[in-house]
Design a protein with these regions (language model features):
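Terminal intrinsically disordered/low-complexity segments used for targeting and assembly
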Residues: 2-78, 236-284, 447-479
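Periplasmic alpha-helical coiled-coil/stalk elements that build and connect Gram-negative outer-membrane
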Residues: 3, 25, 144, 153, ...
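Small/polar, glycine/serine/threonine/aspartate-rich low-complexity segments that form flexible
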Residues: 58-69, 112-143, 147, 257, ...
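A glycine-/polar-enriched beta->alpha junction
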Residues: 81-87, 94-109, 121-124, 132-150, ...
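A short glycine-centered flexible hinge/capping loop motif at secondary-structure junctions
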Residues: 208-212, 410-414, 451-455
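Alpha-helical heptad-repeat coiled-coil segments that mediate oligomerization/polymerization in large
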Residues: 214, 371, 378, 413-416
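Metallo-beta-lactamase
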Residues: 235, 290, 437
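C-terminal structural cap/anchor segments
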Residues: 349-352, 362-388, 395
């Protein structure tokens, strides 16, 4: 009888051991509050101490904090620190990295418990048959390794996508910064032109009242003054919109950049060094373009998926050891089972995987062709923009010399004030033409850098975006 009492306890021991060894991850709720996240966004500032640490980590340690002047390189790092789009891509990268862990997990064994009651058991004999059995799966044909390789390739693609998003953040910041600089300069020139036209209009109006000028000349100058005023008003509105667009590209509220001073020095000097051959630029693009690297990683993942489907043709083995106790008799068993590939040999999934490999290869080839075309078009556009800038620069210098000559003639009394004012207006018109050409050259440079995904100024690095997220570089907007 003592043996009968102890045997069921021995049967229950493995289950107690399994329960003790099982480790559980507890769920910690992190509710997302739209109101709090919106309020947190409105509190973002450029004097954030964590932002200062972030800038220092990448070689832009400010001597004075908060900074008094912000240049393009500083603002790009601000955008990499604050960008919501980049935070989304980082989170997706973390999901892909977690999937590598999932892919590497081995299937857990299963345990089953058996109990049978005997209604005809002799007196004094425990009327139960007790036992348990295991199902131990064993993967074959390297399926686990194929899963891991596929997951790692997709994680690489997600990592490259983080860099691609970082580059797009850089492109948007540069475009908005350039737009703000150009519209601010346009407004400054237009304001001076408006003052000159107003002064000229008063002089011509006096002459018209005295009968010294025709009505046509007076109306023509008045119309020019009105058009300048309208253009100035529209440009000033554009300046306000450009500041708002820059704040958005930085991932900041508009109030965070109110009253900020920007350093536009580099905008006046587009890169005009010696260009390498077009084939060299194409090689640079094919080497640096992160979307190409991501497409290549996705192709590798498609190949690994095909290897996995081919490996699934070979069935996994399931070992089934078991134990039963009945009336003092200990019975052990050992069995195994496999799936018989009689009705199908996984042909459908293999065919789908093969088609995905072909599609991934076609996608990569098409992207390569598009990149080469973009580089060719952007290179031609930038060289043309530099030639236009050279021509307008020459005309501007000629107009500058002409104005100096007119200033000298006016000082000696050879010409009147009306003639001098018209010459000054011509000079500022040439200055506006040069500004437009300079803006177009900077836009063309931006298009070339975007096609190459390589900054000519070497003032930007993708490393902040490619690193693993850290507490100092990420914001938590949910509580």
């Amino acid at each position: 009888m003592k043996a009968m009492r102890e045997s069921p306890r021995r049967l229950l021991a493995p289950f107690a051991l399994l329960a003790a060894l099982s480790a559980c991850v507890r769920y910690h709720p992190r509710p997302l509050s739209p109101r709090r996240s919106a309020a947190a966004f409105q509190t973002r500032r450029l004097d954030d101490a964590k932002l200062r640490v972030f800038l220092s980590d990448y070689g832009r340690a400010p001597k004075h904090w908060p900074k008094r002047h912000w240049n393009l390189g500083d603002l790009i790092l601000v955008a990499l620190y604050e960008s919501p789009e980049l935070a989304v891509q980082r989170a997706r990268w973390q999901v892909a990295r977690a999937h590598v862990i999932t892919a590497g997990e081995r299937p857990n064994p299963r345990v089953g418990f058996l109990s049978q009651h005997h209604s005809m058991a002799p007196e004094g004999v425990l009327p139960w048959t007790l036992g348990f059995s295991f199902d131990i799966p064993i993967e074959t044909a390297g399926k686990r390794g194929d899963r891991i390789q596929k997951a790692e390739a997709l994680a690489d693609a997600a990592r490259f996508q983080v860099g691609e998003t970082a580059w797009q953040v850089r492109v948007r910041v540069r475009q908005r910064f350039l737009d703000l600089w150009a519209t601010t300069e346009q407004a400054r020139l237009l304001k001076t032109q408006a003052q000159l036209r107003e002064r000229l209009l008063k002089l011509v109006e006096q002459r018209f009242a005295a009968g010294e000028n025709s009505a046509f000349a007076f109306n023509s100058i008045r119309l020019g003054w009105r058009r300048t005023q309208m253009t100035l008003s529209a440009t000033e509105a554009h300046v306000a919109r450009a500041r708002a667009a820059l704040a958005q590209s930085l991932g900041l509220p508009l109030g965070a950049i109110a009253g900020l001073h920007f350093d536009f020095t580099n905008m006046n000097h587009p890169f005009a060094g010696q260009y390498p051959p077009l084939t060299t630029l194409e090689r640079v693009a094919l080497r640096h373009r992160l979307d190409l690297q991501a497409a290549l990683a996705r192709y590798s993942a498609a190949e690994d998926a095909l290897k996995l489907e081919i490996a699934k043709q070979y069935p996994d083995v399931h070992l089934g050891p078991g134990y039963e106790w009945e009336e003092g008799d200990n019975r052990w068993s050992l069995g195994f089972s496999i799936s018989l590939p009689l009705l199908n040999q996984n042909q459908g999934p293999i065919a789908e995987a093969k088609a995905r490999v072909v599609a991934a290869a076609a996608t990569f080839t098409a992207l390569q062709a598009r990149v080469i075309g973009q580089v060719s078009q952007a290179t031609t556009g930038y060289r043309g923009a530099l030639k236009t800038l050279q021509v307008t620069g020459g005309l501007f210098e000629a107009q500058r010399k002409s104005q100096r000559l007119f200033e000298q003639r006016f000082a000696t009394g050879k010409i009147g004030l009306v003639t001098l004012l018209k010459e000054r207006l011509a000079f500022f018109a040439a200055a506006r033409d040069r500004l437009i050409a300079l803006q177009q050259a900077q836009q063309a440079l931006g298009a070339l850098e975007e096609a190459l995904q390589y900054p000519f100024a070497k003032s930007f690095s993708l490393m902040p975006a490619m690193r693993h997220p850290s507490p100092s570089s990420l914001r938590h907007t949910h509580s």
